[in-house]
C-alpha cells in the first residue's frame, strides 16, 4: 500500500506526498499490529448452545475479525458422539472482536444425555439440559420486564445464520418458567404460533410470561430445546434499568465532571467550557475556529452523540424530562439517580442533595446551556460546532475548539417554551432562578418574532399562562389548540422535526394536568384527544409486527428501529391520564424490544443484558474500554436497519430490516446514537416502568440470591 501511495504522490500531489511521509511510521505500525494479531489470534469455543431440538450451536469467540476463521469446510471434521453432523451453517458477526455461531444439524437431543462434540478446533463434552443449556431461539427482555404491565412475553424463532429461518416441526413444545436460584417452576404453558414475520424474516412463536410474578431472576425452559437468558420482573430489575437509562444523560453532559462517586473517573474537570464566538453556518464538523475570535464561558447541555457538538435539537431532552415529571411527580425525588447537583461557580462538583428532584436537576442542566447561547437581543445560537471530530479519548484531554453557529429563529422559537416551562417548574424551589428563566423566555419569543413555529408558539403560550395567569397567553392557547391534533402524525418522526413543525406532547400536556390555573374544558379535551390518537396509532403499529418494534415498514430514520421510547411516550402519557391498562401494556412491550426481545436477541443498551453491544461509536467509551471498564453504560445505539460496513455471514444486505446490524464502531448508522434521538425518551420512560424508587447500584439483582 505504501508503494502504491508513493507512486500516486509522484503524479503531482506534493501535499499527499508530505502526508505519506509523515504517516509512514503509522502505516508501518498498523501493518505490524495486523500481522501481530493474526499471529496471536485466539479462537475460543466458549459455549455449546442450541437453536432447535436438533441443532447445536458451537459458539466461538475470537480476538480477531476473520470471517472464515472457524473451519466449516469439512463436514466430517465436525462429529457428535463420533458421528458426523448432518449439515453446517453459520452466523459470523463483529463483537469483541468477533463471534462465530456454528449451527450443526444433529439427531434430536435427549434431555440429561452426555455428548461429546469434536470440532476442527478441539472437542467439548457436555450434558444437554433443557433447564441449563442456552437456546438462542428464545428472545426475551434480559434486563427487567415492567410489573405494571399485564402483557409480558418472550418470542421463540429459529434462525440458523446463512441457513435461514426455520419453522418448528411437529407439535409445538411446552415451556416452563423456573426460578434460577432453586429451579422451582413458577409458570407453565405451550408455545403459540404467531406466524411468519416480514419485518424480521422469522417464523415466530410466543411464550406468555404474564403469569410470572414480580421478582426473579427466572429462566424460560422450552421442552427439548433449552433455556433463555435470565430475566426479572419489576422490583430491583426494573429500577436498575431505569437507573442505568436515566444516568446516560449524566454521562453525556458537557461542561460537567463525570467522576466517582457518581460514575467511573472519566473526567474530573468540566470540559468544553470555552466557546469561540464564530457565528458560523450550520453544518456537522465544518465550522472553522481560528482561535482569534472572542470567547465566553459556557456550562450545561450535552455532547450530541459520539462527538461533542451541542445543537438545538437537544432541547427535546429537558422538555421531555419536565413533561414526564408533571405526568408522574410521585415517581421522582432528590438523590434518586446518584447525580451531582451542587457545584461551585466553575461547576466543579461539591456534592448532591439540593432538595430538587433529580429529573428536574437534569432538565435544568439541559436548559441552562441555552441561556449562555442567548444574546442580549434575545436571539439564540443554533449551537456549537468545530472542524472535524474530537479524538477517541476522555473529553478532559480534548483540545478541540468549539465555536458558535449562527443565530437561528428556530433556536429562539424552541427555547422560548423550554425556558418558560423550566421557570414554572423550578419556581417552588428557586424563585429567583424562575424569574431569570422567564426573562430568557420572553426575550427568545420576541426575537423569534414572525418566524416562531406554531408548535413552539403554543408551547410558550401554555407555559406562560400557567406561570403568570396572563389572559392574552390563555387566549392564544385557545386559538391554537386545534393544531395539536397534528401530534398523531409526527410523534414518531425523526426528532430533528421537533425543532421545526413536528409536535411533541410537551407542547401542550402541561395544560391538561394544570391545577393552579383555570382551564378551558374544550381545550383540555382537544389536547387529550391528540394524546389518545397518537397512542391508538402506536398500538396499531405494535400489533403489526411479531416483535415489539413499533414501527410501520416505511418508517426509516437513523435509530428508528430502537426509538421505542419515543413511540411509547404517547401511550405512557395516555395511561397517566386514564390508567387504562392497554396503554401501559403497550408502552412496556415497546420498551422490551431494545433489552433483547428482538430477532437478534441483542440488548442494544450498553452495560445491560447478556448479549451486549461492545463497540458504540462513542469517543469516551473508547477511553473507558481501554481502562478495562467496558463502554459507558446506558448508551442506546441506533441498532438495526439501514446500511453500514463490517464483517457478517450472512451479508446483512440480504436480511430483513430487524436483522440488518453489525456491532462495528465505524458503521455509525448502527453503532452511533444521539442524546436527542436515542437517550432522551428511554431516560424518561424506563424509570416510570420501574415505578420510580431508588436503586442501589452496588447490588446487581442478577448476582444476588433471591427469596
Please place each PLM-identified region on the residue numbering.
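N-terminal secretory signal peptides that target proteins for export/translocation
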Residues: 1-23
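Hydrophobic h-region of N-terminal signal peptides that target proteins for export
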Residues: 31-40
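Aromatic (Trp/Tyr) and acidic
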Residues: 43-79, 91-100, 143-146, 150-224, ...
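Surface-exposed, short loops/turns at beta-strand junctions within beta-sandwich domains
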Residues: 105-113, 210-216
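Acidic, Ser/Thr/Gly/Pro-rich low-complexity segments and short DxT(G/T)-type signature motifs
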Residues: 108-137
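Short Trp-Ser/Thr-centered turn/loop motifs at beta-strand boundaries
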Residues: 122-125, 149, 225-234
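Long, well-ordered core segments of solenoidal/helical folds
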Residues: 236-261, 360-378, 438-452, 471-494, ...
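Acidic, glycine-anchored loop motifs typical of Ca2+
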Residues: 338, 345-359
